[in-house]
Each structure stands twice: as C-alpha cells, then as structure tokens.
Amino acid sequence: MKLSLNETRVIGVLIEKEVTTPDQYPMSLNALTNACNQKTNREPVLNLSETEVQESLDALAKQGLVVESRVGNRIPKYKHRFCNSEFGELQFTKQELAIVCTLFLRGAQTPGELRTRTNRLCTFADVQETEKVLQGLIDHSRGSYVVKLEREPGKRESRYAHLFSGDAATTVAQIPATTNTSTPAQSNSPQNNAELLERVEMLELTVEELQNQINKLVEQLGG
C-alpha cells in the first residue's frame, strides 16, 4: 500500500469523523472536502477541490479502502474500509488506529503531541503508553507501519511518521519543514510549552466542533 498525501488526508478524515461525529458519517463529497481543507487539526493545510477529493476517492475505492454508500436517490456518501473490516488485512486496536489517523492528518509528531491530539479518538494514560503503542506499530508482525525519525537539532523528543506512503525517505519528503522561533528560555520550559499546547488544542477542538455544526446544517439544507 502506497498512498498519496491527498489519499491519506481523505482516509484520515473518514476515520476521524466516524468516531467524533458518527451522526454525519458516512460523508458526502462536499462535507469530506471541507473536512480535508480544515485549517485546524490539519498539517499541512490543504486547499483541495471536490474534483481532487473525488479522484482520491476513486483511487482508494480501486484498492478497496473506500466504499460508496447511497440510499435511494440521495447524494452518494463515502466510508472507509481502511482497517478492521471483516476480510481486510489491517487490524488495529483503538489506540493504534488513533495514532495512524492523527499521523495521516497532521504529519510527523512527537509522542506527547500524539497523546494530546488523539484525545477525541482514544485515551492514553501517559506519554509512556503512547510510546509503547508506537513501538508496537514499528514492530508489527505484518511489517512496520510507523518510523521513528532522527531527533531534530534543539528538540527534546523525536517525531514519528507513518509509512503508508512508502519508505522513510518518501515519508520525510512529505513532511513540512519546521522552524524553531522560541528563545532558549522558552525552549527549556516544558511546563509553559505544555500549557500553551493544551490551550491551542482546546481552541482547535472548539473551532472544529463549530465547523462540524455548520457542515451538518449545510447538509440538512441541501438534502
């Protein structure tokens, strides 16, 4: 399996919305496109057209990873068959799937970031538990699904990336460059960084909830 950036974004959104907004799942093309292009909880932020999303859906359908669901004459909606299906090869625990989904949506991340950002999909007791699940995805019996990247200069933690887009070199090539604008004092203040990260995450979740409500209203008015 070798998925493009757009394809991992589509699958990541479908996995996310299946858990967080089950009443809006399966998803229409319009709702899926809006969710793919969210400015919160997405890295990199994309600006995909409905045509591009449809092309990704078609490519994923050929691989058996997405199916169309249509009732009567209503607009088609889509759901993933990425894993945990009856005849599928991929079988993940709730925690494993949450990590893969979040890596699809936000690129390479540290265990601490993953623990915080998966909180709507699953629960991790602490960072150590997150690291244990990541190691399980690296040592998986069917092959590695995740890779631990080399620690960046000035960073305290290594980041992890998924391998569903190819080998480590391909994965790294898709990761947006990061810059460190913090002063040394700020960098050496984990407590302040953690508090700031938590506040940002809460704001992002609030914005996402509002966007979900808007999408639901649009669906109702359009249907």
Swiss-Prot record:
User: Which Gene3D superfamilies would you find in this protein's record?
Assistant: Winged helix-like DNA-binding domain superfamily/Winged helix DNA-binding domain
- InterPro entries hit by this protein: DUF480 (IPR007432), WH-like_DNA-bd_sf (IPR036388), WH_DNA-bd_sf (IPR036390)
Q: Which family does it belong to?
A: Belongs to the UPF0502 family.
The record ties this protein, via PANTHER family, to: UPF0502 PROTEIN YCEH (PTHR38768:SF1)
**Which protein is depicted?**
UPF0502 protein Sde_2426
The organism of origin for this protein? Saccharophagus degradans (strain 2-40 / ATCC 43961 / DSM 17024)
| Lineage of origin | Bacteria, Pseudomonadati, Pseudomonadota, Gammaproteobacteria, Cellvibrionales
